[in-house]
Every structure is written in C-alpha cells, then in structure tokens.
Amino acid sequence: MPGRGRCPDCGSTELVEDSHYSQSQLVCSDCGCVVTEGVLTTTFSDEGNLREVTYSRSTGENEQVSRSQQRGLRRVRDLCRVLQLPPTFEDTAVAYYQQAYRHSGIRAARLQKKEVLVGCCVLITCRQHNWPLTMGAICTLLYADLDVFSSTYMQIVKLLGLDVPSLCLAELVKTYCSSFKLFQASPSVPAKYVEDKEKMLSRTMQLVELANETWLVTGRHPLPVITAATFLAWQSLQPADRLSCSLARFCKLANVDLPYPASSRLQELLAVLLRMAEQLAWLRVLRLDKRSVVKHIGDLLQHRQSLVRSAFRDGTAEVETREKEPPGWGQGQGEGEVGNNSLGLPQGKRPASPALLLPPCMLKSPKRICPVPPVSTVTGDENISDSEIEQYLRTPQEVRDFQRAQAARQAATSVPNPP
C-alpha cells in the first residue's frame, strides 16, 4: 500500500512497506530507494514526517538486562556445559532464571543468594527431566552453603509454582556407583578388590530398595545410604578377602568422599539384615553378628519380601494376640516350650517379639527430652489463706478493714456457745 511522506531522491509519494526477512522497510515504488529501515522499532509508520522513536518510548526500556542478570545467565549456561547437559536443559534453566529474576524479592536479594539461584534453576531442570544430579554436587561446584542452597531452592519452587518430582534413586545409584574406581585393576587398587560393575550395581540396587522399604531412606540424604549399600554389596561378593576392609578405606580405594552419616546408615542396614537372618532356620543356629552376616547377604536378598514381612510387620499381630490372652493362660505351656526351645534362653524366658517397622526417628528417643508441664487443678473456688490475702492489699484503708474483720472473727470464735 502507498504510504505517507515523499521519497528523498525522486520526490514520489508512492512509498510501500517491503518486508525483508524479519525487518520491515519503507521503499519507494518508483525509484526503489529504501527510505527507512526498521519501521516497527525506530519509526511511527502512520506519521508523515517519519520521526524516530525515542528510547524512553520504545520497548527497549522494559527489556533492559542488568549486569547482575547478565552475569547470572552466563553462569547458568557455563554450569550446564560443565555438567554436559543437553541444549534443551540449558534453555529451560535460562528461562527459569529469567522468571525468577522478575520477582522483586530475588532482585533485591544479597549476592550469595543470587549466586545460589544459578544452581537452583539447573537442579530444577535436571529433576524435571529425571537427570541424576544431587544438591550436594551443585553446592560443590558453586562453593555454596548447603543450607542457603536448600532454602533458596524451596523458595524458587514456590515462587514459580513448579512441579518438581523427587529424585530417582535407581538413576542416582547407577551414576554414583559408576564413579567408583573399583572396576579395573590399578596400582592403587589390588586385584582382590576389583569387582564386576554389573554385579555390584545389581546388588547395590537391591540393598537400596531394602533400605527404602525399612524407612532408612525417608527424609535423609541419599548419598550416605548409597555409599553404605555399595560397601556392603562389594564386601558380600567376595567376603573372604574384603571383610577386613573398613568403610573409610573402601572410600579411599574407590576415590570418593566418605559422607559423614554413612557409618550410621551402615549400622542401620546391618541391624536390618540381622533381623532378617533370625527368620531363616539355617542362619539362626550360626549366631550371626554384624560382621558375619555380610557373608549371607545374597541369601537374605533372595527372600527379601518374606523376611521383611516376618521380621517386622508380623510383630504387630503378635503383640495384639498376646494382649488378648488372659493373664494366667498358657503359663505352663509357655514354660514347657521355653525349656525345650533351641535358642538357649533361660528358664521362664520367652523369645522376644519381632520389632515394629518404624522410622529410626521414632525408635530412638530425642536428644533433649521436653519436660512435661505440671497438671494444674486450680478451679478458682479454693480458699485464700491469710498470708496470701496480704499480697492483694494495696491501701491503708484496706489494711485496717482487714484487721478489724480478722479481730471480729477471732472474737466470735472465742465466745462459748450457749448451753
């Protein structure tokens, strides 16, 4: 369509808009002279004088990116490339960073929180795509504090309204165990400590699933549990040569860091395995301990479902049955059974009932016991003693009235009753 204005070369008024790729141009239809370029961003197309639009009236003012945001976007891209994430992950993480930066609470936050925001956006993207990446790994790369990172992570998820799935343990086990330097012989790893990768992954996964079924994973960091499960799986495949190796030496041979709670998770896993071993007759007579039970982990995992059910979950039914029994019923029969049992218990002692399957936080008492407040039975109708009444007297007149009343009471009690 012809536009307003004149061509500066020939003076023609036949000006038309011609789109050249993504940029609109105003061209003279008579001589072909390009009158102006970028009509949508630099000029008003409906004005005859074709004045340039000032920056304050253009859309560029609202699209200005601060230096802090530019630096954050570069760090997001750099972190994705260091982790060798796919390009789609990088685009998603950048989009989350831009959305989070629009909130005033994030823009006005301190520098430490803005640096942590980079890792939070990358972690959210990895979780949504089921990519095995832990919060601790990102904190190590960014030299960030774990508490600050976790609080910022929860804040960003809430601000953006994102649906972030939980971490997939199976993928994390595969990724974490693949970093262990125990699958080929080297000068630092003796030949007796080298193990097949597939066998070790399979048994580690079974032990992690057992820990998940027995409440050892809930509410805890996954890496200590996986480290303890990997150590037990590695020991159980060749127990004769590896029982003497400690958890700290194992982590040193594998060239991985030893998480602080890993030793506690190891003891909890061994306690669960011992309870399961008590349900097998051929293992009950061996009097296993936490060291020797490692040799029979393969048998215990083979019958894992039934052993866990009989070792823990049947304990509730047994307790309820004993509560329903009369106090004196079965005493003679119980003593006869105890005297002939194969467990070697003292006379008059019965075998302990299976423990309930509860989280460790419910089985262990808290470190600081909260004092129980005393039960108050004050109703407000109690008699007030004389010493307590004096605390409520304020003026001299009240003191004199109270003294007169007290004297009258004593005089009335001293008068003898008439016959």
UniProtKB/Swiss-Prot annotation:
UniProt KW Heme keyword: no
Entry superkingdom: Eukaryota
Stretches with biased composition (Basic and acidic residues): 314-326
PROSITE patterns: ZF_TFIIB
Phosphoserine sites (modified residues): 353
Protein's UniProt keywords contain Metal-binding: yes
Cellular component, GO, one term: nucleoplasm
PTM field: In response to oxidative stress, Cys-361 is reversibly oxidized to cysteine sulfenic acid. Oxidation of Cys-361 impairs formation of a ternary complex with TBP and DNA and down-regulates expression of target genes in response to oxidative stress.
Region annotated Disordered, chain positions: 314-351
Segments for region (Required for the formation of a ternary complex with DNA and TBP): 357-363
Region listing for Interaction with target DNA, in residue ranges: 108-114
Pfam families in the record: BRF2-like_C_cyclin_rpt, Zn_Ribbon_TF
Subcellular location: Nucleus
Residues annotated as binding Zn(2+): 7, 10, 28, 31
Gene Ontology BP, a term: regulation of transcription by RNA polymerase III
Function summary: General activator of RNA polymerase III transcription. Factor exclusively required for RNA polymerase III transcription of genes with promoter elements upstream of the initiation sites. Contributes to the regulation of gene expression; functions as activator in the absence of oxidative stress. Down-regulates expression of target genes in response to oxidative stress. Overexpression protects cells against apoptosis in response to oxidative stress.
Family statement: Belongs to the TFIIB family.
Subunit text: Component of TFIIIB complexes. The TFIIIB complex has two activities, alpha and beta. The TFIIIB-alpha activity complex is composed of TBP, BDP1, and a complex containing both BRF2 and at least four stably associated proteins; this complex inhibits the transcription by pol III via its phosphorylation by CK2; YY1 facilitates the TFIIIB-alpha complex formation. Interacts with TBP; this interaction promotes recruitment of BRF2 to TATA box-containing promoters.
Protein name: Transcription factor IIIB 50 kDa subunit
Species this chain originates from: Homo sapiens (Human)
